[in-house]
Amino acid sequence: MKNRIEAIKQQIDAFELNSADKLEAFRLQFLVRKGSIAELFNQLKELSPVDRPEYGQRLNKLKKFAESTYEEAEKKLDVLASGKGKQHRDLTLPGRRQYTGSEHPVQQVLGDMKQIFKAMGFTIATGPELELDSYNFDKLNFPSNHPARDMQDTFFITKNGKDDDLLLRTHTSPVQIRVMLDEKPPIRVICPGKVYRNEAISARSYCVFHQLEGLYIDKRVSFADLKATIYSFAKQMFGSDVQLRFRPSFFPFTEPSAEVDVTCYLCGGKGCRVCKQSGWLEILGCGMVHPNVLRNCSIDPDEYSGFAFGMGVDRTALLRYKIDDIRLLFENDVRMLEQFSR
């Protein structure tokens, strides 16, 4: 039996397993119940009890060797059949282009905004996107019946009519409240971040967008300081030729309040469909911080005054890159985004 085992091992070594037919022939010869290895197992009962354990171990090793040889050959044939094993390479072909990533247009604009305001002496403050009702509305002088506090305009997480109601912040103004509660004047900060509004998605509006707000609190701060800050920002952001106008407006947290427009990027102020024939596009809202807001943050309005402003980063990106649909900024279409890489 010893010679027979050795002979079968040599047959296994010499077997050419280079096709599916030969692989099947190997299986039929060595691995089936009527194969040569199985026949040797049947002959074990003819051996003496002394020799039977030794040859049983040898046969088990032979069987495992045959099975492993079969499995390895089967894997190689599967790889070749799928084409993964082919090594045909034309080394004369040019290499594939390596695409490099770039900053998203919104992040580019936000980065430029930060640099402009940092050069003016502003620091950066951030806060939670899941905010308390009291920080988002009450401390900002919003009356209890203000439309913004309705479920149709704000994403409420919990709404029990209490100060501890949770919501997705509708602006980054709560960050200003947190700063005024934690720090003493003078305060000069910008607050960038995501905000959420329960709005219908369209070419001009989205349910989530990026906002940057600014706050300056000190003694004898005036509206002239606010205008100088906005003018300086706009000239650096949109170019020295841009024209601005301030329009009276209303916000609960500022008094007086204004909205700021710049000349339309598409028509240069002549009037077109983007600016609705007005020649102007709104870029931000601003005003002097309301005395009630200062009092809510334990700041004496008789001693200190300040201004605040807020702008949509996404809308500014639309203006800068002449994009006419805000939804394009959120679709992550690389073909569109790579046009604005720098």
UniProtKB/Swiss-Prot annotation:
Protein location: Cytoplasm
Chain residues that bind Mg(2+): E255
UniProt xrefs under CDD domains: PheRS_alpha_core
Any one of the GO BP annotations: phenylalanyl-tRNA aminoacylation
EC assignment: 6.1.1.20
Protein origin, superkingdom: Bacteria
Entry keyword set: Aminoacyl-tRNA synthetase, ATP-binding, Cytoplasm, Ligase, Magnesium, Metal-binding, Nucleotide-binding, Protein biosynthesis
InterPro entries: aa-tRNA-synth_II (IPR006195), aa-tRNA-synth_II/BPL/LPL (IPR045864), Phe-tRNA-synth_IIc_asu (IPR004529), Phe-tRNA_ligase_II_N (IPR004188), Phe_tRNA_ligase_alpha1_bac (IPR022911), Phenylalanyl-tRNA_Synthase (IPR002319), tRNA-bd_arm (IPR010978)
Protein biosynthesis as UniProt keyword: yes
Reaction(s) the record says it catalyses: tRNA(Phe) + L-phenylalanine + ATP = L-phenylalanyl-tRNA(Phe) + AMP + diphosphate + H(+)
The family this protein is said to belong to: Belongs to the class-II aminoacyl-tRNA synthetase family. Phe-tRNA synthetase alpha subunit type 1 subfamily.
Name under which the protein is recorded: Phenylalanine--tRNA ligase alpha subunit
Organism: Chlorobium phaeobacteroides (strain BS1)
Gene: pheS
